[in-house]
């Protein structure tokens, strides 16, 4: 799940979910959250367009859920890619929780992108956390530690946890000096980590060429500014001396499957 808004810098998270949908064997809409009570339409205006016959089409902000059929023996995947609502976050979280329960989900993964001190010359780091302590330990993820004012995603995570659903949050750090959309490297990094943690093939390699082109474009811009080039070099040193934000290894997907089996047996 990913929503356009404060925690989707450069559209990296929603691009990742949209890529999963477009890569599926098939997709079926299973739910649509009515935008009427959740949006201030003076801030998020509907879009009018013309079809092939010249008839006007009005498109309202959408938060739709799709069930995707994937390759192999992977169970179906339900995705929500939409827009962060302005109003009634608690009611919106309840709507998402209802979709998750009706679809039989036991795990919800939210994707996000935030501006950070990340050099564009390095693989972009992904921060991961899990609401379930056993799952967090098995996957080498942290537990949520933030305290203070929160947004829709924070309210959503709490509600899903109260429903008994495990929640994993994956957030990629986007270079704060280049936040324009699209950012194929950020999208690739999110998809790669999602695949690593869940074992679901995400096709992240398809972003490799676009990510390289994006990096070359930023390289050229940075090279023309001595101060910026020096700043990026300092960021590189900082990142090179830090540890990876998520563990690597094929055993992570196996650990997730073991957790799902254990929780099924307990239920």
Protein language model regions, located:
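Catalytic cores of processing enzymes, dominated by hydrolases/peptidases
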Residues: 117-201
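A conserved C-terminal secondary-structure "cap"
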Residues: 178-267
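N-terminal short beta-loop-beta anion/metal-coordinating cradle
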Residues: 1-84
């Amino acid at each position: 799940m990913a929503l356009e808004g404060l925690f989707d810098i450069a559209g990296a998270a929603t691009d990742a979910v949209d890529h999963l949908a477009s890569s599926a064997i098939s997709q079926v809409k299973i739910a649509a959250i009515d935008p009427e009570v959740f949006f201030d339409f003076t801030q998020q205006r509907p879009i009018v367009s013309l079809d092939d016959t010249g008839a006007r089409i009005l498109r309202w902000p959408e938060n739709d859920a799709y069930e995707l059929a994937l390759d192999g023996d992977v169970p179906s995947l339900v995705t929500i890619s939409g827009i962060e609502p302005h109003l009634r976050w608690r009611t919106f979280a309840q709507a998402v929780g209802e979709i998750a329960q009706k679809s039989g989900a036991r795990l919800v993964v939210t994707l996000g992108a935030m501006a950070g001190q990340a050099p564009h010359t390095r693989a972009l780091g992904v921060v991961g956390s899990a609401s379930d302590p056993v799952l967090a330990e098995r996957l080498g993820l942290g537990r949520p530690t933030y305290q203070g004012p929160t947004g829709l995603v924070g309210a959503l995570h709490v509600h899903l946890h109260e429903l008994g659903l495990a929640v994993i949050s994956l957030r990629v750090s986007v270079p704060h000096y280049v936040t324009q959309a699209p950012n194929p490297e950020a999208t690739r990094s999110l998809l790669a980590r999602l695949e690593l943690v869940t074992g679901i093939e995400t096709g992240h390699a398809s972003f490799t060429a676009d990510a390289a082109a994006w990096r070359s474009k930023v390289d050229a811009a940075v090279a023309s500014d001595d101060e910026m080039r020096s700043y990026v070099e300092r960021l590189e040193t900082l990142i090179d001396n830090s540890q990876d934000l998520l563990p690597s290894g094929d055993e992570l997907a196996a650990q997730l499957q073991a957790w799902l089996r254990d929780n099924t047996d307990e239920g």
